[in-house]
From Swiss-Prot:
One GO cellular component term noted in the UniProt record for this chain: cytoplasm
Gene: mgfK
Family named by the database record: Belongs to the gluconeogenesis factor family.
Protein name: Gluconeogenesis factor
Other information: When bacteria are grown on a gluconeogenic carbon source, overproduction can restore a normal rod-shaped morphology in a mreB mutant by rescuing the PBP1 localization.
GO molecular function (one): LPPG:FO 2-phospho-L-lactate transferase activity
Lineage: superkingdom: Bacteria
Amino acid sequence: MGQKPKIAIFGGGTGLSVLLRGLKHKPVDITAIVTVADDGGSSGRLRNELKIPPPGDIRNVLAALSDVEPLVEDLFQHRFNKGNDLTGHSLGNLILAAMTNITGDFFHAVTEMSKVLNVRGKVLPAANASVVLHAEMEDGRVVSGESTIPEYGQRIKRVFLTPEQIDPLPETIDVIREADLIIIGPGSLYTSILPNLLVPKIGEEVIKAPAKKVYICNVMTQPGETLHYTAADHVKALNQHMGCGFIDTILVNSEDIPDEIKRKYEMESARPVDFDIEELKAMGLEVIRDQIVTYKNDVIRHDTHKVASLLVDLLKE
């Protein structure tokens, strides 16, 4: 039997976890590279108190790729709602914090938890230490902190990380170089995706890598990040931060969003991401448009199995 094709996926937040739940059932070798810029909620508290990278996004990805009894996954994802010190904490975050203490660093903690949860694939933090995400707004102000940036309410000019000199894991560089397909997204453009690519050497290696680079565009705009952005605007922001055009293919949703769901999102200043196929093609992009969303409790999500199948099809080209 031949070696399974290798896929490297960059992201964070809910979008990445949703995609991985479908992709893990395909005959591919998955590595998820996950942001360590989160500073809100349980992750932010553990990051500040224990001086470890934020575990929340990593926890969600481990759960998505796990192959354990549903009750074990539920236990790992359980969030406490009582107790002064425990309220708001996820048990999985606490376990990752404890494992970091036991193993000596965050990367080895993630590696060991991957074994415990029988993870299909690999999960790598973008760096083995916390980073701080900053955004320079179009009004000139610099806002610091991943959770603070969307609250400022101005258009983002650029984002950057401190410390500037932070090393990616050698394993991450190897994964990028050996990948048959590199997937970027879905996820928050400025606070989940770019914090990965801005880690020194990671962006450079992605640009140089021979693998096809696929951007899975968000279905809806995000208040405080991508208000009024088109699909082309998302790609332009990625290119601007990387210093060149590096995306080969973009996956966009062609399905009309039901009016009642649109109205709900509009109440939160979010709307469907528009796309102009000719504009995207003029940027040198291969455009794949399909009905790639599902709805649950009036929340829009990428259809994990449909998107996974489309990505596997790209490996056959």
